[in-house]
Design a protein with these regions (language model features):
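Extracytoplasmic/periplasmic substrate-binding proteins
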Residues: 52, 111-112, 249-336
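Glycine-centered hinge/linker elements that transmit conformational signals in sensory
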Residues: 188, 230-266
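Extracytoplasmic/periplasmic solute-binding protein
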Residues: 146-154, 183-236
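Extracytoplasmic "Venus flytrap"/periplasmic binding protein-like
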Residues: 68-135, 166-177, 284, 299-300, ...
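A structural signal for short loop-to-beta-strand junctions that line the ligand-binding cleft
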Residues: 93-94, 102, 130-166, 195-196, ...
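Hinge/lid segment of periplasmic solute-binding proteins
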Residues: 32-41, 107-160, 174, 183, ...
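Conserved C-terminal helix/tail region of periplasmic/extracytoplasmic solute-binding proteins
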Residues: 169, 387-440
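Extracytoplasmic/periplasmic substrate-recognition and gating elements
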Residues: 71-72, 77, 97, 147, ...
Length: 440
């Protein structure tokens, strides 16, 4: 990425890039007529694409996609960089220095508008016709009244609790659907000689995944929509203590996960969590979803996986799998190689290889319109759970990832014992108001 900083067009010249953006839709429409930006059209394409995104769990799959694209467009060079820790901070530093990646990521929802001034509106591109309607809805601008398509997704998704079905069978218990059942299950599993939980609590982003069902249940108990409750916290008009599911149940859940979890929870990252669960001696894997199954089965092909929502209170109906597209990839609207970037993303969503990549390589819930069944248990059980119990609200998207990171760090301080529950709540409330209240 260093070289792209040196060759970045100065601010005074961005008019040319904007003009290129205006004309690119016409160019692309012509290409769409011939095999939807298909492979035959791309062999003469050239240029560099700099991708800087989060989600390192998809690094292998994306590298496979890039390798395949090399066969299609041999003169296009794709420089791909990924990180999870401090991604929002690193991205903002790149944007401020003028080194804006050609493709960058954020959460969907609120952050679509946060980064809209840098994002190309994909409306009219072949990719939008192929995109799942629910995913496309997450890419619209709330400030523009639900218009535009300012991103694409690596995946739709399912978030929830993963368990080792063999361990639950051996212990004679079913998957917990209430918080009390979860605590009892952890006791039973440990008494039988297994580890109950592996948490990944070193990663800030696992907390935002864990908390979604709690946010939804807290709002429901108060007779309000989750989005409205989150907006109150952002405005500085709500306290965690006002919501028993957050003040009591959430911390009870975290305490239970730590008590029955990894020896060093704050040193257990995604890889450590995957290794611990795949070893076959741990009952519950927290904070994850459909994206980990391929890694788990690569380590232990005999693993029997179960998947459902998080147990958050006394009502099994609130134990819901959360589905949707939580992440957006943005195309930089003033990219020097805008057409080359558009050709790549259109190929990804419309070519036969690109469409099969989602299920066959990445093992994710496809963000495209498709009837193809998945070979992955989490995706199929997630789909079944949503059909039976409905989907939980993708509530992390009502906040920015800058807040979500601060939330994760506040919870890490709580687990470390450096802040108590009330101080942690005060910090979360302060961050929600200062980070996301200011972002509105």
């Amino acid at each position: 990425s260093g070289s792209s900083e040196e060759t970045q067009a100065p601010a005074a010249d961005t008019g040319d890039a904007a003009q290129e953006a205006e004309t690119s839709e016409e160019t692309d429409a012509a290409e769409a007529d011939t095999e939807a930006a298909g492979e035959a059209d791309l062999s003469a394409d050239s240029g560099e694409i700099y991708i800087f995104i989060s989600s390192p769990e998809y690094a292998d799959a994306i590298n496979t996609l890039i390798d395949e694209y090399k066969n299609v467009a041999p003169n296009v060079t794709i420089n791909y960089e990924t990180t999870q820790n401090d991604y929002p901070t690193l991205l903002k530093a790149k944007i401020n220095s003028g080194d804006v990646p050609d493709i960058f990521s954020s959460t969907s929802g609120m952050e679509i508008d946060t980064y809209r001034e840098y994002s190309y509106d994909l409306t009219g591109q072949p990719i939008v016709d192929a995109m799942d309607d629910g995913v496309a809805a997450a890419m619209t601008s709330a400030e523009e009244g639900g218009k535009g398509c300012y991103g694409l997704a690596i995946k739709g998704n399912y978030f929830g609790l993963i368990w080792n079905q063999n361990i639950l069978d051996d212990c004679g218990i079913s998957a917990p659907e209430t918080l009390d059942d979860f605590k009892k299950a952890c006791e039973t599993v440990e008494a039988k000689g297994y580890q109950a939980c592996t948490t990944g609590f070193m990663e800030w982003w696992v907390y935002k995944h864990n908390v979604m069902d709690f946010l939804n249940a807290a709002a429901k108990a108060n007779g309000e929509a989750t989005a409205d409750m989150v907006a109150k916290f952002q405005a500085g008009e709500a306290k965690i203590k006002d919501y028993s599911v957050l003040y009591d149940n959430w911390f009870d859940y975290i305490d239970t996960a730590v008590k029955y979890g990894d020896d060093k929870p704050l040193e257990t990252d995604l890889s450590g969590e995957e290794q611990a669960f795949a070893a076959g001696n741990t009952a519950f894997m927290l904070g994850q979803g459909a994206w980990v199954e391929a890694d788990l089965l690569a380590i232990n092909p005999d693993l029997k996986i179960g998947f459902g929502g998080y147990p958050v209170d006394a009502d099994p109906a609130d134990c819901q799998v959360v589905s949707g597209s939580d992440q957006a990839l943005h195309v930089y609207k003033d990219s020097k190689n805008l057409q080359t970037v558009l050709n790549f993303v259109n190929w990804w969503y419309t070519s036969e290889y690109g469409q099969s990549w989602f299920t066959d390589v990445a093992g994710v819930v496809p963000p495209i319109k498709t009837d193809k069944e998945s070979a992955y248990t989490i995706i199929e059980q997630g789909k079944k759970s949503v059909e039976e119990k409905g989907s939980g609200d993708l509530s992390i998207c009502y906040s920015t990832d800058s807040f979500n990171q601060a939330f994760g760090e506040a919870m890490q301080s709580y687990i470390a014992g450096t802040t108590d529950k009330d101080a942690t709540c005060a910090q979360i409330e302060k961050d929600w108001h200062e980070i996301d209240g200011a972002a509105k």
